[in-house]
Amino acid sequence: MNKGKIKQIIGSVMDISFESGNMPEIYNAVEIQTKVNGKDVTITAEVQQHIGDNTVRAISLQSTDGLKRGLEVTDTGIPISVPVGTKTLGRIFNVLGEAIDELGDLPKDVKKMPIHRNAPTYEEIKPKTEIFETGIKVIDLLAPYIKGGKTGLFGGAGVGKTVLIQELINNIAKQHGGFSVFAGVGERTREGNDLWNEMKESGVIDKTVLCFGQMNEPPGARLRVALSALTMAENFRDESGSDILLFVDNIFRFSQAGSEVSALLGRMPSAVGYQPTLSTEMGGLQERITSTTRGSITSVQAIYVPADDLTDPAPATAFTHLDATTVLSRAISEKGIYPAVDPLDSTSRIMNPQIVGEEHYSTAREVQRILQRYKDLQDIIAILGMDELSEDDKILVARARRLEKFLSQPFHVAEQFTGRPGKYVKLEDTIRSFKGIIEGKYDSLPEQAFYMVGSIDEVIEAAKQLKG
């Protein structure tokens, strides 16, 4: 193994000199043994640049506390490698693939894979576009996810992002028999801890791998943790041939960490202070999230929009890769309608009659038309009251209120809060139910019967109980 010495340390960036002809390759992991508070620790860094004079510039993936000039550095000869396979299920890892859940070390024979690899070739990519059924009515009908596609999840604090993510993990585990990988990129440690505890309570932890690079960690760790999680997901896809769900929360922090690393490496900043390699870094991550002939990775990415400016380079770069957007609205959550997905703001690339079929397309568009008209009439209703509306508009408003309530759904992972058993609604049942409502077949049923149910059959049953 090549040995080198630290020449300079600035924050989490270090320059390391090696002997001529024994230089480590770009992206190789290098290790430094040192003592911190009397304990032996190994600090890992990643080679980023060859700066001449037999010297490399590396970015540390851990705190550089305790490091000093002259310390010996070992080139591992390979990039950062993380454990993969079924032995990782139910565990929490850091960027280096070390278990951080205090449940003991992984077996010695666990397979490891490097986090840097090429995206699938054109021959390996599966070109067919299929709907990814989530069992959540509002998503499947109005902004369907794509198998092997990428969805952006927009939402503020407390509108239900985490619960929606948990329900998707639960549904894919039970209905599709697949695994989920969660990448916490620049996450609050408390949120990661809450998610782990909630997953244990709801019973989905055994089908999930969690990978965290927290807010308090150096930018190198936050930049690479998404790749660590993606590598685990790729192995599940390629080895088990199943549909994998990859959650990234938050993709903005990935770009933010890249910006910090870029500045530390001395690159000239680009627009709004972001790194000049922003598009390349985002593309390198996103292009690996895809369907191949062996299986698919479907990704749901939470996206923070700085100052609500959608033209900011970080979210704007992410948008170009998204196939669907799910917008969570505080106004809808205040009405007690969960999931609080905005039916008019959420979009999907496959909302096309040639892909989803004419019946699905026309039903979804009519639902949106009715809800949009109801939104337009809100001011008139608030000022003049319902009596001033035309007969057609009165019928439309009544129908819209039923649709709005019917877009709510009890979740399996929220059973302990709501007291209602969770519902998974198949796509054909969703289309049939909404088609019946927009055609006026259920105008006579009370509004309350449409709230927090699965398919239309449950509405009819609830209406009987309300009347009885």
UniProtKB/Swiss-Prot annotation:
<comment type="similarity">
    <text>Belongs to the ATPase alpha/beta chains family.</text>
</comment>
<dbReference type="InterPro" id="IPR004100">
    <property type="entry name" value="ATPase_F1/V1/A1_a/bsu_N"/>
</dbReference>
<comment type="subunit">
    <text>F-type ATPases have 2 components, CF(1) - the catalytic core - and CF(0) - the membrane proton channel. CF(1) has five subunits: alpha(3), beta(3), gamma(1), delta(1), epsilon(1). CF(0) has three main subunits: a(1), b(2) and c(9-12). The alpha and beta chains form an alternating ring which encloses part of the gamma chain. CF(1) is attached to CF(0) by a central stalk formed by the gamma and epsilon chains, while a peripheral stalk is formed by the delta and b chains.</text>
</comment>
<protein>
    <recommendedName>
        <fullName>ATP synthase subunit beta</fullName>
        <ecNumber>7.1.2.2</ecNumber>
    </recommendedName>
</protein>
<dbReference type="InterPro" id="IPR005722">
    <property type="entry name" value="ATP_synth_F1_bsu"/>
</dbReference>
<dbReference type="InterPro" id="IPR000194">
    <property type="entry name" value="ATPase_F1/V1/A1_a/bsu_nucl-bd"/>
</dbReference>
<keyword id="KW-0997">Cell inner membrane</keyword>
<keyword id="KW-0067">ATP-binding</keyword>
<keyword id="KW-0375">Hydrogen ion transport</keyword>
<dbReference type="GO" id="GO:0045259">
    <property type="term" value="C:proton-transporting ATP synthase complex"/>
</dbReference>
<dbReference type="GO" id="GO:0016887">
    <property type="term" value="F:ATP hydrolysis activity"/>
</dbReference>
<keyword id="KW-0139">CF(1)</keyword>
<comment type="function">
    <text>Produces ATP from ADP in the presence of a proton gradient across the membrane. The catalytic sites are hosted primarily by the beta subunits.</text>
</comment>
<dbReference type="InterPro" id="IPR055190">
    <property type="entry name" value="ATP-synt_VA_C"/>
</dbReference>
<dbReference type="InterPro" id="IPR020003">
    <property type="entry name" value="ATPase_a/bsu_AS"/>
</dbReference>
<dbReference type="InterPro" id="IPR050053">
    <property type="entry name" value="ATPase_alpha/beta_chains"/>
</dbReference>
<dbReference type="GO" id="GO:0005886">
    <property type="term" value="C:plasma membrane"/>
</dbReference>
<dbReference type="Pfam" id="PF02874">
    <property type="entry name" value="ATP-synt_ab_N"/>
</dbReference>
<feature type="binding site">
    <location>
        <begin position="155"/>
        <end position="162"/>
    </location>
    <ligand>
        <name>ATP</name>
    </ligand>
</feature>
<dbReference type="GO" id="GO:0005524">
    <property type="term" value="F:ATP binding"/>
</dbReference>
<dbReference type="Pfam" id="PF22919">
    <property type="entry name" value="ATP-synt_VA_C"/>
</dbReference>
<keyword id="KW-0547">Nucleotide-binding</keyword>
<keyword id="KW-0406">Ion transport</keyword>
<keyword id="KW-0066">ATP synthesis</keyword>
<dbReference type="Pfam" id="PF00006">
    <property type="entry name" value="ATP-synt_ab"/>
</dbReference>
<dbReference type="InterPro" id="IPR036121">
    <property type="entry name" value="ATPase_F1/V1/A1_a/bsu_N_sf"/>
</dbReference>
<keyword id="KW-0813">Transport</keyword>
<keyword id="KW-0472">Membrane</keyword>
<keyword id="KW-1003">Cell membrane</keyword>
<dbReference type="GO" id="GO:0046933">
    <property type="term" value="F:proton-transporting ATP synthase activity, rotational mechanism"/>
</dbReference>
<dbReference type="InterPro" id="IPR024034">
    <property type="entry name" value="ATPase_F1/V1_b/a_C"/>
</dbReference>
<keyword id="KW-1278">Translocase</keyword>
<dbReference type="InterPro" id="IPR003593">
    <property type="entry name" value="AAA+_ATPase"/>
</dbReference>
<dbReference type="InterPro" id="IPR027417">
    <property type="entry name" value="P-loop_NTPase"/>
</dbReference>
